[in-house]
């Protein structure tokens, strides 16, 4: 006990942060603080569970479902969520070997702890009692919490016998370890590869920004020349602009064969095992497949609806996608000779040439107009136009890396709304891609105080150099808007319970706020607010904006089918009814072939790096990106009709969708905003897809 008291005095997780808005004191947290904080959080959770279970009073919503301490009136389970939020955020954005060791050690302990709660027979009996005999009329939010609590326990094995519960523990603990190993393997493989160029002639075709970034990377590694990596800001321009076909092939093969090699980072067997573990888990709980288990709590509701969406999209988009690819192939043959055979590492290069030929437009032409600082102003300004909120950088708020900026966010009435962190650039120990996360969620405490969220957007944009500020592509502007949309969902949260707050919604609804915001990237009136040349200050010319709008559907059908192919692959794995024994690489090619137009190489593999469905929560859920696209096109059509900055429409979207989190069924929330259920029509119209109706 003495050790614990010492820890209580020194471990920053155990004492009030005493920082602006109770933000995380990153500079005070050391690696050795995490494990004791996790263990103390688990101890406090166990103590809280015992209090609920042994409460002599009849189970009620307050003493059992809301998990309120009857003596102190406080909510239970605060410490563990506090340390877990920080640790998981750091594992993605600022990890190191020591953190990965902590994760390996804590992962099975935390999984066991979660199972100890959900498989606690006495606790479930109390929850079931309240579920079957509510002690009073419940609000819709309380009813949702009661239903999700009860169903969460059932879905976690509460109705199983002891043998079944033990089996469930084994399955979840193994899956937890394997997802962690999958992610660590992928990070190591991606960071291990570099293309080191010392002959300047091999940079032919590359834009200055790509060359400068590669020179900067080489300098950081104390090497001569230029270094290209598999991080998207380095990889993408190389594949788009490099005239060196063999080097493009080298980059493509490196990126598309990661975690398939004969080394410790091979993910093939891990993926196979994860598919089987999830199938076993679902069948243990009475479902035929893992997809059936997952879709029970999705807007799609069942596999038939998912396949209908994916197949409808294939039918609508495939003819146009085939034409798009043939156009690229025709241009390649025109430039290289009729015997030229296009390979996967050529597609980005020649499709870019086609884009230039058709629209005289490419990402690099726009980059000078998208200086990151100005884009930030534009995005914040958009939020102000729509919702009246303002952002103010506060250097007193601690950050975990010098690249990170922290802002206070204020509502239209001037009241404090949230803390917003932005982490823009790639670095060692940071996962690729882009995401939104939270260091603190939103809820209303026992005294009625509205605890406001601390949200973070993490991206990997091209870094500034000595000569140039950070300049974005239009695609990166879209990425920023996407993650910012998620953050608005978090920042506008206004619910009583944290587990129903912000982005804690059904998985095929969570992408609506993010994809909705992407629509603004090609809106003329939005671009005019921030797109100025970083050197001359000249605004983005109208004729360039017109070309952006005209080219917005360039390769849209091909892009749609690519996403659909990922959805098909996901469903193929998670609709397995028997043990999955196939070889991953050929199985993958078969699973998505009806949505594939370009031929693939037999040795490449997506599955082993498909974090979304293997380690990221999108298992049997990848279709939700396309599902949300139907929603976002439908929702944005209201803004197009009423005005893209219309505050009344924006307020309705905030009140009925963004602030409500998961407190009601998502379709109920959507219809309250839209007045009707969504249709696919707005998406087809946006992409200029004409469907031939049969009959």
What are these regions (language model features)?
Residues 48-59, 83-94, 157-160, 258, ...:
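Secondary-structure edge/capping motif, primarily at the C-terminal ends of alpha-helices
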Residues 462-481:
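Short pre-active-site segment immediately N-terminal to the catalytic Zn-binding motif
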């Amino acid at each position: 006990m003495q050790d614990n008291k010492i820890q209580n005095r020194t471990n920053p997780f155990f004492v009030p942060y005493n920082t602006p808005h109770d933000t995380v004191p990153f500079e005070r947290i050391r690696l050795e603080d995490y494990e004791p904080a996790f263990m103390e959080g688990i101890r406090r959770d166990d103590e809280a569970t015992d209090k609920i279970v042994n409460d002599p009073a009849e189970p009620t919503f307050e003493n059992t479902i809301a998990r309120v301490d009857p003596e102190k009136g406080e909510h239970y389970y605060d410490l563990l969520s506090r340390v877990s939020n920080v640790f998981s955020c750091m594992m993605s954005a600022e990890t190191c070997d020591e953190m990965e060791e902590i994760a390996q050690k804590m992962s099975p302990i935390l999984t066991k702890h979660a199972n100890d709660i959900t498989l606690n027979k006495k606790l479930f009996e109390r929850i079931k009692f309240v579920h079957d005999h509510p002690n009073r009329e419940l609000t819709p939010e309380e009813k949702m919490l009661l239903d999700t609590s009860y169903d969460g326990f059932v879905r976690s094995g509460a109705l199983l016998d002891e043998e079944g519960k033990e089996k469930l523990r084994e399955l979840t603990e193994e899956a937890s370890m394997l997802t962690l190993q999958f992610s660590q393997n992928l990070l190591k493989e991606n960071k291990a590869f570099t293309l080191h160029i010392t002959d300047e002639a091999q940079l032919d075709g590359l834009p200055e920004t790509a060359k400068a970034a590669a020179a900067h990377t080489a300098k950081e590694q104390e090497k001569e020349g230029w270094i290209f990596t598999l991080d998207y800001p380095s990889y993408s321009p190389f594949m788009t602009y490099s005239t060196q076909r063999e080097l493009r092939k080298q980059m493509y093969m490196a990126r598309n064969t990661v975690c398939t090699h004969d080394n410790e980072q091979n993910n093939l067997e891990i993926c196979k095992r994860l598919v089987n573990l999830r199938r076993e888990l679902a069948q243990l709980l009475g479902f035929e497949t893992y997809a059936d288990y997952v879709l029970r709590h999705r807007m799609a509701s069942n596999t038939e609806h998912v396949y209908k969406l994916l197949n409808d999209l294939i039918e609508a988009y495939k003819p146009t996608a085939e034409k798009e690819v043939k156009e690229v192939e025709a241009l390649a043959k025109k430039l290289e000779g009729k015997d030229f055979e296009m390979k996967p590492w050529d597609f980005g290069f020649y499709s870019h040439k086609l884009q230039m030929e058709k629209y005289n437009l490419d990402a690099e032409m726009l980059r000078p107009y998208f200086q990151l600082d100005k884009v930030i102003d534009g995005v914040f300004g958009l939020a102000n136009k729509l919702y009246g909120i303002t952002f103010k950088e506060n250097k007193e708020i601690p950050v975990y890396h010098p690249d990170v900026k922290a802002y206070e966010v204020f509502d239209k009435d001037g009241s404090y709304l949230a803390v917003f962190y932005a982490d823009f650039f790639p670095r060692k120990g940071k996962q690729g891609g882009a995401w939104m996360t939270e260091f603190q969620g939103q809820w209303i405490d026992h005294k009625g105080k509205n605890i406001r969220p601390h949200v973070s957007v993490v991206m990997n944009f091209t870094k500034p150099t000595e000569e140039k500020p950070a300049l974005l592509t239009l695609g990166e502007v879209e990425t920023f808007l996407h993650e910012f949309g998620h953050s608005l969902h978090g920042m506008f949260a206004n619910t009583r319970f944290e587990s129903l707050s912000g982005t804690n919604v059904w998985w095929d609804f969570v992408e609506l706020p993010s994809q909705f915001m992407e629509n603004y990237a090609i809106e003329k009136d939005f671009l005019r607010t921030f797109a100025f040349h970083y050197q001359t200050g000249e605004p983005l010319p109208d004729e360039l904006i017109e070309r952006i709008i005209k080219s917005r559907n360039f390769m849209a059908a091909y892009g749609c089918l690519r996403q659909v192919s990922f959805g098909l692959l996901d469903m193929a794995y998670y609709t397995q009814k028997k043990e999955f024994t196939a070889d991953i690489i050929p199985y993958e090619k078969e699973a998505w072939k009806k949505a594939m137009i370009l031929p693939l190489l037999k040795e490449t593999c997506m599955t082993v790096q498909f974090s979304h469905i293997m380690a990221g929560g999108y298992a049997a859920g990848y279709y939700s990106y396309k599902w949300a696209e139907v929603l976002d096109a439908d929702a944005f059509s209201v803004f197009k009709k009423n005005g893209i900055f219309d505050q009344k429409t924006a307020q309705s979207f905030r009140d009925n969708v963004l602030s409500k989190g998961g407190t009601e069924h998502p379709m109920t929330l959507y219809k309250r905003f839209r007045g009707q259920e969504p249709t696919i029509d707005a998406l087809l119209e946006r992409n200029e897809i004409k469907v031939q109706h049969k009959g």
